[in-house]
A protein has these predicted regions:
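Conserved acid/base catalytic micro-environments in cytosolic active-site loops
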Residues: 1-201
Length: 201
């Protein structure tokens, strides 16, 4: 299912304003030229009007940010997000599958949904990263990624108020790395394969 030249799949999960700030910080430190598909989940109410794509595009000018379309094959060097009522998950051909999140049926479980999908469908060429938040969403998904042979990372809260999200991770499976955004980006730069000169469109 996964050839050695297939891109890795990296998924970030966070919640709240601190989580958004951490996403922006990590995306601005994102290593250039890595052969990896990048997906981001931030907790949002399903009935919200969301400007997340515009915010990320403005604050992270070095990355192209897209709202994934159902069935779209995701490619490296693009940051993909879902919609508030259609959270992003991934199929085994690296195409987006936007699941039904209307009426908040997946409220505070959208990170786990994405993490579980990459663990099940991609396997060992995956990285799950949990950033700031006050909930445990992502902990079960990280455990699934670990069982599939992927890498699991957690943001070190440093001097920030410690959220339950990071605390819960320790109870659900080993973590590959804990660090700040810059350190996580440096580890990814060393671990992920480099992209060939072929341009993806």
């Amino acid at each position: 299912m996964n050839a050695d030249n297939d891109p890795y799949c990296v998924a970030l999960g966070a919640s709240g304003s601190e989580g958004l700030s951490d996403i922006i910080e990590l995306l601005n430190a994102w290593p250039k030229g890595v052969h990896a598909v990048l997906m981001v989940v931030l907790h949002r109410s399903s009935d919200d009007h969301s400007d997340l794509r515009a915010v990320l595009a403005h604050r992270c000018p070095d990355l192209h940010v897209e709202i994934a379309r159902d069935g779209q094959v995701l490619v490296p060097n693009v940051c993909y997000i879902g919609m508030p009522d259609r959270p992003l998950t991934l199929l085994d051909d690296r195409s987006a599958f936007l699941i039904d999140g209307s009426n908040d049926r997946l409220r505070n479980r959208t990170v786990d949904a994405l993490f579980h999908s990459i663990a099940e469908n991609i396997g060992k060429r995956t990285v799950g990263i949990v950033l700031s938040g006050s909930l445990d969403d992502g902990s079960r998904g990280l455990a699934a990624i670990h069982r599939a042979g992927g890498l699991t990372m957690v943001l070190d809260p440093q001097n920030k108020p410690v959220g339950m999200q990071q605390n819960a991770i320790a109870f659900d499976g080993p973590i590959t790395f804990v660090g700040n955004s810059t350190e996580i980006a440096q580890v990814l730069d060393g671990l992920l394969p480099r992209q060939s000169h072929r341009v993806h469109r």
